[in-house]
Every structure is written in C-alpha cells, then in structure tokens.
Curated annotation (Swiss-Prot):
Belongs to the complex I subunit 5 family. It comes from the Eukaryota. Its EC number is 7.1.1.2. This is NADH-ubiquinone oxidoreductase chain 5. The gene is MT-ND5. GO terms for biological process: ATP synthesis coupled electron transport; electron transport coupled proton transport. One of its GO terms (cellular component) is mitochondrial inner membrane. It catalyses: a ubiquinone + NADH + 5 H(+)(in) = a ubiquinol + NAD(+) + 4 H(+)(out). The lineage of its organism: Eukaryota, Metazoa, Chordata, Craniata, Vertebrata. Pfam families: NADH5_C (PF06455), Proton_antipo_M (PF00361), Proton_antipo_N (PF00662). The keyword rRNA-binding does not apply.
Amino acid sequence: MSISQLSQMFMTCLSLTMIILILPITFSFITKPSNKWPFQVKNAVKLSFFVSLIPSITCLNLNLQSFTIYYQWFSISSTKINISLQFDQYSMIFMTIALYVTWSILEFAIYYMHTDILINRFFKYLLTFLIAMMILVTANNMFQLFIGWEGVGIMSFLLIGWWYGRADANMAALQAVIYNRVGDIGLMMTMSWLLINTNSWDIQQLFGLTKNMDTTLPATGLLLAATGKSAQFGLHPWLPAAMEGPTPVSALLHSSTMVVAGIFLLIRLHPLIENNNNILTAALCLGAITTLFTATCALTQNDIKKIVGFSTSSQLGLMMVAIGLNQPQLAFLHICTHAFFKAMLFLCSGSIIHSLNDEQDIRKMGGINKTLPLTSSCLTIGSLALMGTPFLAGFFSKDAIIEAINTSHLNAWALVLTLIATSFTAVYSLRIIYFVLMNHPRTLPLSPVNENNPLIANPIKRLAWGSIIAGLILCQYILPNKTQTLTMTPMLKLTALIVSLLGLLTALELASMANKQIKINPTKFTHNFSNMLGFYPHIMHRLMSKLPLMLGQISATQMSDQLWMEKLGPKGIAHTQLLVTQKITHVHKGLIKTYLSIMMLSIIIITIIIMIT
C-alpha cells in the first residue's frame, strides 16, 4: 500500500470517526428530544470505535511511526495557525481505547440515569467531553491542544456539578475549575514562551527549534499544567471531591479523559523535557509523593467511590514517576491498561450503589458476592488488576514502571515511596473486596438488588475482558523493540509482587482488627491523618481562606473603625480638647468671686499695658 493510499485511508477513517461523533450533537439542535437519543449516542460511539479500529490496526501492523495531516486555518502577521492532526501510536491507540471505554460507560449510563429528566442533555455533555479529549489527543499544534484542554475542563465542571441542587456537587465543580485554572496558567505560560521564542506552535517544529535553547521555563509550565489536570500533590483535592458527580461521569473522567490529559500532555511534548534533569527530577519526586499520599488517604476511606477515586490519583502519580524516569512509553502503557479496570471499578461501584438504594458506605455493605455475582466477579478482577496481579492488564504496565525505577540510578527515596504506595494499593483494593463482597450482608433488607439488566452486564463484561487481555496485547506494540536487559536479580524482578503480597497480609490483619476493635471511631493520629486526607483540605480551604478574612475583619474594625473613626476622628479630636476644656470650664461655673477676680485681673493687665506704652 502506497503512502498516498495510506494517507487517504487514514483521513477517511478518522474524519468519519469524528463526523459520527459530532452528528448526534448536531441533530440534537434540529430534531425534537427523543427517548431513543441516548441509545443513538451509544450506537454512534460504538460505530466510531469499529471505524477507528481500521487505521489503528493498520498503524500497529505496519509499525508506522507518525502520520500528520495539515489544513490551513488562519495566520496572524508572520505566524500561521494550521489545523494539524497527528496520528501516531499514542493517538491511534488512545482514541480506540477511549471510544471502547466510552461505549461501555454510555451503555451503563442509560440504565444508571434512566430516571433523570435531563438524560438527553447528560449524554450530550458526555459526548462533548469525549470529542474534546479526541481534539487534545490528535492535536499537532499547541492552539488545537489548548482548545481540547479547555474543552475537557469546562465539560468536567458541567458534569461534576450535574446535580446542581446539592451544595457538595456545586463545591466540587468549582474546586475542579479553580484547581485546573492554576494548571492552565502553566500551559498558557508555555505557549507564550514558545510563540515569543520560536514563532511557532507546531509541535513537530518546536522539537527542532528548541533543541539548543534553555527550555526550563516552558518545561516548568508543562509540569504545572500536568499537576493541575492530572491531580498531582498540591493540586489534588478536586479529584476526590469530583466523586459528587454521577458514577458514569466519574468512570469517564477517571479512565480515559480529563485526568489523563495532563500526563498525555507530558508524553506528547516529552522531547521538550527529556534533557532537562531538573524537571525530570521534579516530576519523579512529585509523582512519588502523589502516589504515596493518595494511597495513604485511600486506606481509611469508607465511601466506595472515594476509595476508587483516590486509587486513580495514586496511579496518576505512578504515571508521573514514569515520566520522571524518562520513560513516556511506560506512562502511556499504564494510561491504556488503567482505563479498562478503572472504568470497570466505577461501573461495578455504580451497580452496587443502585442495588443498595444509593448506599456508598462500604461498612453498610457485605455479602454482595451472593446477590450480585457478576458485579462481584468483575470488581474482584478490577481490584486484582489495580494491584498488579500477574497476567492481568495492570501487571504489564505497573510492573514495568517499578522495574524501570528499580534498575535506574535515580532518587532512592522515590523508589521507596513508590514501593510503599504499591503495597498500600493492595491494602485498599483488598479492603474493598473484604467489606463489600465477603461476610454477611449489612444492608437494609428491602434493597432492589438486580443485575439481570443487559445495560449493566454487557458494559462490565466488556471492560472485564479488557482488564484481562489488554495489557498483554498492548505491551507488544507500545514497549520499544530492543534487546531485553537480562541482568536483573530475582529479588529486583519480583519486587512489585513482593510488596503487593505484603499489602495483602497487611489488609488481612487490618480486616481482622476492624472486626475486633473496641472503639467505634478510631482516635489514632495516623487514622485521622489518612481519613481526613492529611488535613490538606482543612488547611488550604479553611485556614488559607480564614486568614485573609480575619485580616480583613481586623483591618475593617481595628484600622478603620477604631483608628480613623475613633482615635483620629471625632473621638480623637474631642479627647485632645478635653484637657483644655477642663481647665477653662472653671471660668463658666457662675461664681461671683470668679467673675470679680477676672475683672480685677483684666483691669491690672490693661493698666500695666497703658503705663508701659
């Protein structure tokens, strides 16, 4: 097949993929609302997935490195802005996986949101969310990338705050916007620097133009942008708060759209940072701190969605560690495998929540394996894949990252933190299995338990297959074809498995202690630190906002009221005149002797003046 034929095939298939996605949104403005519209959206995404398989499989089989399509858009002075689409292994594989996962999530959402009167608008938002992520992934210039970047940001705000009648949902949506705005500053700073110094936003050109430049400033901006969007430590609180949105939103947000956008940005622009040791070290340490801190927070949470949400943040930290190791392909492999089991974990959580009358507290569950066998089996598979159990999807990416950091001569502290976080992953994953699936039911007796609906079963089963075989398939194509290093000792090779087994033993011990504890509410500082998210929200959201409010109150009451209105104002003037007034008030007391004395004194003074003159 010639290059021109390949070009036409790629252009046709990918244009058709995007057109199929855009058509339902376009027709929604023309036609009247229909109960069938959610099914039409689901079928459109399903069809797009099968169409996108053609160029993806072709790209992987022919081992094509990159394929770029240019369209002239507009020009400002000497700067030309093109619609430039880049199709390489990263964009092709990610598009296919995102469409597959979104197809499953939309099918589940038809069941989950069937009672919502605005379900058509909900599906429109989800589809727009997906399209914005597609724009970001395929962009070959910074302006297009910024459009997709802001698109996923605004759609996350609308979807997290979907139940806008709830104060917590509104607060979570605002948190997502505000924290991501901090990250957006970094991306805009990078774009400004690149335009000033290279006069171009074309990504492929930028790599050559910046080769001999000091790229510390734009690389710092990229790291800040990824920190905000991918919820790294410092800008992470919005991610667990985003659990206030509907479960399908959480599944899409955490698997293949919003949160991986920051990591994907660093993967796409990795040549800008690959030779900057300071930025790589910062990314490595930031990722290690994030993965440990969020895994620690997940240990003592009782909301099933919060636990899965914190696990996402922990895995994003692991991806950032891979970026810091100069291994973007490992970070991308983990993005792809993570999408399957994370979406499945959220769908299983949604199925359980609906079956238990919207109950999310794992302490009030139990015995679900008897009443929801399919959901329980898939939840177990997803949890095992998240732990990195051998031969499931998560093993191939997670184990590769831990092997890479084990064999590198980089920061040993980052290695220790990552290994501890890996152990904690096993702890909270098995904690979910223990509390939700095992022992006797702790639920209300009248719970509408039912998973016989194909809208529940089919999406979860599809994602379960992905969680089992995706890692084995993807690692054949994503990992570089080079001679494997055969010098690792068995201990180094088995490190990830060993720490996961330690986590298993720890989880069993904690579960045993939970059944024997005397106090209902643990009072240890370590428990409170984990359960209250390291006190970070209390410090940043309360203390940091309370301090300026108190300062404003003090300046208003003490500085303005007391100083200007009292000390220096009317009361101050009155006080300075008080001493003089007290002295001269004796003259006006109405005593005759006082008046005679004043008169005699006046006569004497006048006489003396006359005699002198």
